[in-house]
């Protein structure tokens, strides 16, 4: 490598942002139009954006290299893990209102999963379940620690069932005023949590999901492990700084969250939906980081006598990444506006969108991370050159958390039929652009037919149409046009589009707020 080449790389590394919020101006713009008290929130976003880059992100690489270790009942982490965790909980993220929680989670995900995003999502779901379904006594005892330092987790999956929770066999037996849980859980993310939410079947309960109860299991009783042991920690492709294990319960003391017969409704409607929503927020934040890494590198890297950002294919790649990450944020904020809504139409829309959006954004995150790696070339595959390999691995795990793609689209198909909500869903994307409306008219008839082979593609096209409409509404005209042409217009061919180069240049140069100091 020449001295000039090494100097360019050093200047790129020195130019990296020191605050995740300051390089996400579109987040602030979007929140400003959705929150009346945004002025109160913005200083906290500035402060947390700095914490993410300066405290949390530097710790992740070491955490992944060393990784969590476990014995029968304890999980051990490097010291930096606890320090980063305290900084995350100090932000107030676990009990914040939806838009505030989403904004903080988006900034946290600048560092990928980072060992703390999944714990936050699980804790936020438990907080919401306690607030909405637990007895006052249970809420008073277990909620306050979750808002300040304690971590929650949710253990639903069993080896024989996977996403088929109705096949679960872990048992719950009443013991006076409490219950005892016995059985094994197969995917236990946040194995170090202070409070476990465990699904189990009460004795005599009916088969399937109707017989599933939802229980809170404290990790410790009087300082001693509460009837559980960790079989092992999983050796995962991604999210390696966070402990995921197999845990066996043997007579663990448990408290019901809500009535036992409502367990699956609470697990799916509160815990899983919270995680799916925040998974999408995390995917959007991860995409933002991937785009910034690629755009920053391309602005410094020179090849064949010019900066690589000036090559048409690199510019196209960056423009596509930017359109995807902006679209993902807006569709996820659309979900955020529906969280906790009691309006029947909004609740029906939320049932559909929280699943469809998780499916769409997690797929997009993997593709954007891969495009970013392509921009860096061979350097993009080196673990200690940039965070991109880690982000890519995390994104693949995000795809598979809280239901595979096929599980999610199947749920959407069932809900559209059960709640007769197709018109409500389509209407949310209408009235912005005739080309989007035409695509929705075509989709209406196709989405009425729930063909298991083709419905997933139809759902994906709907999500792309919705995201395009949201980009237009947000005033992101160039990004909306690019998204429309790539995903919504039938038979569009870039080579036949005389406006395509100008559109790419507009998308690329639009981001004047993010400066890389040359």
Tell where the protein language model's regions lie, with residue ranges.
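Extended, charge-enriched "interface" segments that sit outside catalytic cores
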Residues: 1-95, 512-518
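Alpha-helix capping/hinge segments and adjacent helical runs
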Residues: 7-18, 22-26, 32, 36, ...
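A short, Trp-centered hydrophobic/proline-enriched beta-strand micro-motif
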Residues: 148-157
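A short core secondary-structure module
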Residues: 178, 182-228
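A glycine-rich, basic-preceded beta-loop-alpha segment at the flavin cofactor/substrate interface
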Residues: 223-227, 231, 246-275, 292-309, ...
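C-terminal helix-coil-helix/basic helical segment that borders enzyme active sites and/or dimer interfaces
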Residues: 326-358, 373-376, 448-453
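C-terminal amphipathic alpha-helical interaction region
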Residues: 428-518
């Amino acid at each position: 490598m020449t001295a000039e080449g090494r100097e360019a790389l050093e200047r790129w590394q020195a130019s990296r942002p020191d605050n995740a919020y300051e390089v996400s101006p579109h987040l602030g713009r979007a929140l400003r139009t959705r929150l009346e008290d945004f002025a109160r929130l913005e200083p906290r976003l500035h402060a947390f954006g700095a914490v993410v880059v300066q405290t949390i992100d530097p710790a992740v690489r070491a955490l992944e290299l060393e990784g969590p270790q476990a014995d029968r009942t304890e999980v051990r982490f490097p010291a930096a893990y606890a320090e980063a965790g305290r900084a995350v909980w100090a932000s107030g993220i676990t009990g914040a209102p939806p838009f505030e929680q989403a904004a903080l989670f988006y900034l946290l995900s600048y560092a990928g999963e980072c060992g703390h995003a999944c714990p936050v999502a699980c804790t936020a779901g438990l907080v919401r379940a306690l607030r909405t379904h637990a007895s006052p006594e249970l809420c008073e005892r277990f909620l306050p620690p979750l808002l300040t330092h304690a971590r929650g987790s949710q253990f639903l999956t069993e080896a024989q069932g996977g996403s088929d929770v109705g096949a679960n066999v872990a048992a719950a037996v009443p013991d006076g005023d409490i219950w005892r849980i016995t059985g094994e859980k197969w995917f236990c993310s946040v194995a170090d949590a202070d409070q476990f939410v465990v699904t189990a079947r009460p004795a005599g309960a009916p088969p399937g999901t109707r017989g599933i109860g939802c229980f809170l299991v404290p990790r410790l009783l009087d300082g001693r492990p509460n009837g559980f042991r960790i079989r092992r920690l999983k050796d995962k492709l991604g999210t390696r700084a966070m402990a995921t294990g197999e845990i066996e319960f043997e007579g663990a003391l448990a408290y019901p969250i809500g009535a036992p017969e409502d367990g699956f409704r609470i697990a799916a409607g509160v815990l899983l939906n919270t995680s799916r929503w925040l998974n999408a927020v995390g995917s959007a934040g991860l995409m933002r980081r991937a785009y910034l890494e690629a755009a920053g590198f391309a602005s410094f890297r020179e090849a064949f006598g010019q900066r690589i950002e000036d090559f048409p294919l690199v510019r196209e790649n960056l423009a596509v990444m930017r359109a995807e990450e902006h679209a993902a944020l807006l569709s996820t904020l659309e979900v955020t506006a529906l969280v906790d809504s009691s309006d029947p139409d909004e609740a029906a829309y939320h049932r559909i969108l929280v699943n469809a959006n998780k499916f769409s954004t997690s797929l997009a995150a993997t593709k954007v991370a891969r495009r970013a790696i392509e921009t860096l070339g061979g350097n993009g595959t080196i673990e200690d050159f940039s965070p991109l390999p880690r982000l890519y691995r995390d994104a693949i795990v995000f795809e598979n958390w809280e239901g595979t793609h096929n599980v999610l689209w199947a749920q959407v198909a069932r809900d559209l039929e059960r709640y007769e909500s197709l018109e409500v869903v389509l209407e949310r994307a209408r009235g912005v652009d005739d080309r989007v409306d035409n695509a929705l008219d075509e989709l209406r008839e196709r989405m009425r037919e729930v063909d298991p082979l083709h419905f997933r593609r139809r759902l994906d096209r709907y999500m792309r149409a919705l995201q395009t409409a949201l980009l237009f509404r947000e005033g992101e005209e160039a990004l909306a046009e690019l998204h429309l042409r790539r995903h919504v217009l039938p038979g569009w061919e870039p080579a036949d589009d005389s406006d395509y180069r100008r559109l790419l240049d507009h998308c690329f140069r639009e981001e004047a707020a993010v400066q890389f100091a040359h």
